[in-house]
């Protein structure tokens, strides 16, 4: 079980959105590299980064900020947002990104996911962001007609490293992860599932280490860290104790 601190990039700055709304963005750090170093110093072992502008534009828009983070931290980085073709995937992996996250293209171009997962084993994840049960695309601005489970099942045998499941309705609101839906998804597929959206406090960490969440591969935490609602030392210690038990 991995706890991923999140850095969302908008105009080169670290921000947090509420329910995926770009007009409801709060800037938390003007220097993404400094934020990445801070998370590394706190003891986190894997960084989750999203290029929000890229998710809307369909191509990388915060490359300089991402590259600055890659230069200052040694921990692995998974990156999503605006990754829609094999050339972009290859470029990011070549620059030091450990794992890319394919979101919109997983819905619109499933062959890309399969080709990328085959070419780069263990380095391709799929991001499924759901609103009212349906997967949203294009930076959450548009809704599709397919469910997260339907998309996840498409890639069962593709060698995808992980499914990152986000409940958009909870994202950035600190009301707690939607563990029921995430655990249900994890129980239905063999691909590792990472929970995202709504992480609010140490109570979410306690819920993640319960036996019913044993199939989950991790969770992404954002605003709770920036707001100081989650003590990283306490959270990581709790997860380490659970792993050793």
Swiss-Prot record:
| Keywords for the protein's UniProt record, in alphabetical order | Amino-acid biosynthesis, Cytoplasm, Histidine biosynthesis, Isomerase
InterPro entries associated with the record: Aldolase_TIM (IPR013785), His_biosynth (IPR006062), HisA_bact_arch (IPR006063), Isoase_HisA-like (IPR044524), Isoase_HisA-like_bact (IPR023016), RibuloseP-bd_barrel (IPR011060)
What is one GO cellular-component annotation here?
cytoplasm
Q: Which GO terms describe its biological process?
A: L-histidine biosynthetic process; L-tryptophan biosynthetic process
What's its EC? 5.3.1.16
Molecular function (Gene Ontology), one example: 1-(5-phosphoribosyl)-5-[(5-phosphoribosylamino)methylideneamino]imidazole-4-carboxamide isomerase activity
Task: Quote the subcellular location field of this record.
Answer: Cytoplasm
Q: In which pathway does it act?
A: Amino-acid biosynthesis; L-histidine biosynthesis; L-histidine from 5-phospho-alpha-D-ribose 1-diphosphate: step 4/9
Q: Where is the active site?
A: 8 (proton acceptor), 129 (proton donor)
Q: Please write the reaction equations for the catalytic activity of this protein.
A: 1-(5-phospho-beta-D-ribosyl)-5-[(5-phospho-beta-D-ribosylamino)methylideneamino]imidazole-4-carboxamide = 5-[(5-phospho-1-deoxy-D-ribulos-1-ylimino)methylamino]-1-(5-phospho-beta-D-ribosyl)imidazole-4-carboxamide
Q: What Pfam families does UniProt report for this protein, alphabetically?
A: His_biosynth (PF00977)
Q: Which NCBIfam families match?
A: 1-(5-phosphoribosyl)-5-[(5-phosphoribosylamino)methylideneamino]imidazole-4-carboxamide isomerase, PRK13585.1
Please state which protein family the record places this protein in.
Belongs to the HisA/HisF family.
What name appears for this protein in its UniProt entry?
A: 1-(5-phosphoribosyl)-5-[(5-phosphoribosylamino)methylideneamino] imidazole-4-carboxamide isomerase
Which species does the entry assign this protein to? Rhodopseudomonas palustris (strain BisB18)
Gene behind this chain?
hisA
